[in-house]
Amino acid sequence: REAGTHLLTNQDMGYEYRSSKYKRERKPIIILEATFVGGHADPQASLDLLHDLTEKRKKTQPVGPSFGSTFKNPPGNFAGKLLAEAGMKGETCGGASFSNVHANFIVNHGNATAQDYYCLIRRGQKRVKEQFGIDLQLEIELLGEFHDVE
């Protein structure tokens, strides 16, 4: 394992949809800082766009505690749509549930454990596989040991 701080470019990271070179190769790194270079834009137009996007997000994604999107979108489809059509919205395990706003988000109701999240992840994967023949791939990384209970 290389110790120390390294400067990596966008190309070094090998970014792809919901992935990077380091994620694919399972090389643990910690990103301490990132610099983004963008084009020039009107400051007020940028603020207006940010406001519009924030308002849209409030209407389409849960605002409570969650870890964001749980599953990657399969080619030609949307994980949230598949989960919703499979009846997963509101599905609960312990202190966690699939969001009623967007089914690809699992929300914590204050006392959820990692096992509660895992229970819902497996339940969602199973139901989507049974109904649509699609294997949902995790967007998140699981840390720890989990057991199937169903």
Name these PLM-found stretches:
Residues 2-119, 126, 131, 135-150:
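Phosphate/pyrophosphate- and phosphate-bearing ligand-binding catalytic cores of soluble enzymes
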